[in-house]
């Protein structure tokens, strides 16, 4: 609004009554490389305030007037498939067919764009959409943006081929990337994608998980004041750690050369190695728990390259430690809860669902005060009034836990938080959710954000929450808010729908035929059979496009009928189970075996 460009971190100078008159991005402490420093900026601003105070106050008034005027330029539109198709074309136009990703350097993973492409490809029978997502996922894994020694992805690549990253690792990136790789695995069955997801999750469990179950924000790029020092190696270091022959083989596998690929050192990568898929599917030797897809850890199963990774992992820890940002944020933790829950369901790994359950318990215990969400927790202190992203993402996380566990308490809590979100943040006149609550801190304007940038916007996530609650409960209260929200999003994305790819996921959910599957399960069913059936249904709920799954049993019948009134029409059988499937407006006769419906699902 002030300079025509943006960036991070944000620097704002304000009047004493909190009206901005100057903005910028990063300023070093002192001037360098021709760039003014913060000390010089503040000194100059103080001088201007003394001699030109009225001019600065007038400037602040003009900025305030402009910001307030933007609220009245909002327009609404009807959700339609034209925007969905346009978003695909926009992404296709800037797709890098050689290296994957979109546009030129720097390249960001933008996992929600990839999830959109996979969903679009499945619904529209457009294999080229899936191919774009797959190419990107493969090349990102092969590149240096993925940590081949310790797992996890860095924030972005400074080049076009994903080789040299900005080495900072963030929780939200890795959460969304797990979701993208799990989506790819569910769509294709290609084992590699499941392995990458597991390696990200093992990194998060090992490096970013608090002893009480919450997830930390991330790790810095620098160690000893040097960016990337922790992650790069010389050829001599590799040989010293692994021995001459093993070191030589490892260097050949992972592109470690004498001249290096980053300031004289080498970032391990598989960009020149055609055996990347086979290497990806091998288990690690980093003490990881491992999983069904990658067969457990190297402590129990061999794997020469990964034993070498274990030794290099320990070597670099001993060589230089990274600073860890150990704040625990509700919104970012919620994304990792979603990722863990989805991975657990699709990979058949209960340990990942357990990670999600523990993180939820942490939020419930430490980040709720007087019935409202806080923003962050650190060292025993919870602070900050929850914003839209906190309520929307946490509601979605609880709905994801319901989707994979079918525990009614998750659904109940999701609905309760979504009610607060709607009451405190929703603009009932024009649609859209404000960033700040109506009873929270009041700034000069109440803003709304819709652009799905590094993370999906709170407005896009809120739309998905409303949609899922509507599909599960059938409550028309959610429908009214959802309809207004989608009209608001449709207006906001006009002309640039590809910048709202997560919002488009909900739009597709609404515009394409939906599927509902109700399973009624007798109490006499064998316990192990019930467990396996629930796992199968959870997998379907995550992987099948447009499918909502509900399980009703004698144990949860009363609560289900209160939260989901239409389940009163689905009696629990005396023995076995019955499955009721509706596709669009067509409902089929109940069948006693899920296998009878698999093709339609």
Residue ranges and their predicted role:
Residues 120-124, 184-192, 343-350, 401-408, ...:
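Inter-helical turn/loop segments and adjacent helix faces that build the functional surface
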Residues 139-146, 358-366:
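Glycine-rich, acidic and aromatic/proline-enriched surface loops and short helix-turn segments
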Residues 1-339, 343-346, 486-601:
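Replace the tail clause
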Residues 206-209, 368-392, 399-561:
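Long, polar/charge-rich, low-hydrophobicity segments
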Residues 314, 318, 342, 346, ...:
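Conserved helix-loop functional segments at active or binding sites
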Residues 153, 174-177, 181, 340, ...:
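Extended, hydrophobic alpha-helical segments in both membrane/secreted and soluble proteins
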């Amino acid at each position: 609004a002030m300079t025509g460009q943006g960036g991070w971190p944000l620097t704002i100078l304000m009047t004493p009554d909190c009206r901005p008159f100057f903005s910028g991005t990063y300023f070093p402490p002192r001037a360098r490389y021709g760039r003014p420093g913060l000390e010089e900026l503040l000194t100059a601003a103080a001088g201007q305030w003394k001699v030109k105070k009225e001019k600065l106050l007038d400037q602040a008034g003009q900025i305030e007037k402009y910001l307030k005027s933007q609220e009245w330029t909002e327009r609404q539109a009807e959700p339609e498939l034209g925007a969905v198709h346009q978003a695909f074309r926009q992404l296709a136009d800037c797709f890098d067919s050689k290296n994957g990703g979109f546009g030129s350097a720097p390249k960001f993973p933008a996992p929600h764009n990839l999830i959109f492409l996979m969903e679009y490809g499945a619904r529209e029978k457009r294999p080229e959409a899936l191919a774009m997502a797959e190419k990107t996922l493969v090349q990102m894994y092969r590149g240096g943006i993925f940590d081949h020694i310790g797992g996890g992805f860095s924030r972005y690549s400074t080049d076009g081929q994903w080789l040299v990253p900005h080495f900072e690792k963030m929780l939200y990136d890795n959460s969304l990337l797990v979701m993208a790789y799990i989506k790819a695995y569910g769509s294709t069955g290609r084992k590699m994608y499941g392995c990458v997801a597991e390696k990200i999750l093992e990194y998060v469990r090992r490096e970013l998980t608090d002893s009480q179950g919450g997830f930390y924000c991330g790790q810095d790029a620098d160690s000893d004041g040097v960016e990337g020092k922790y992650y790069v190696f010389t050829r001599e270091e590799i040989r010293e750690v692994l021995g001459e022959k093993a070191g030589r083989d490892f260097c050949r596998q992972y592109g470690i050369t004498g001249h290096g690929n980053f300031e004289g050192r080498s970032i391990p990568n598989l960009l020149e190695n055609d055996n990347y898929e086979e290497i990806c599917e091998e288990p690690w030797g980093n003490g990881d728990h491992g999983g069904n897809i990658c067969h457990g850890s190297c402590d129990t199963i061999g794997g020469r390259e990964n034993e070498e990774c274990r030794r290099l992992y320990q070597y670099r820890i001993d060589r230089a430690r990274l600073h860890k940002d150990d704040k625990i944020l509700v919104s970012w933790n919620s994304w990792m809860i979603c990722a863990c829950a989805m991975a657990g369901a699709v990979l058949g790994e209960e340990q990942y669902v357990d990670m999600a359950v523990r993180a939820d318990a942490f939020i419930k215990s430490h980040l709720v005060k007087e019935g409202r969400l806080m923003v962050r927790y650190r060292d025993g202190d919870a602070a900050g009034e929850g914003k839209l992203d906190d309520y929307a993402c946490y509601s979605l996380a609880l709905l994801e836990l319901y989707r994979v566990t079918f525990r009614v308490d998750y659904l109940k809590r999701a609905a309760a938080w979504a009610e607060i979100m709607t009451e405190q943040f929703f603009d009932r006149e024009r649609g859209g959710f404000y960033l700040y609550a109506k009873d929270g801190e009041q700034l000069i304007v109440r803003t709304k954000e819709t652009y799905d940038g590094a993370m999906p916007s709170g407005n896009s996530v809120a739309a998905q929450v409303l949609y899922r609650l509507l599909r599960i409960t059938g409550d028309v209260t959610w429908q009214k808010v959802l309809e207004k929200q989608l009209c608001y999003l449709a207006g906001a994305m006009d002309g640039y729908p590809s910048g709202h790819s997560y919002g488009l996921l909900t739009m597709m959910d609404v515009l394409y035929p939906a599927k509902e599957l109700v399973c009624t399960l007798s109490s006499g069913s064998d316990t192990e059979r019930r467990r396996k059936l629930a796992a199968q249904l959870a997998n379907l709920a995550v992987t099948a496009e447009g499918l909502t799954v509900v399980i009703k049993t004698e144990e949860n019948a009363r609560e289900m009928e209160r939260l989901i009134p239409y389940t009163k029409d689905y009696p629990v059988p005396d023995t076995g189970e019955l499955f009721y499937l509706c596709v669009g407006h067509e409902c089929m006769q109940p069948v006693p075996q899920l296998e009878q419906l698999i093709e339609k699902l």
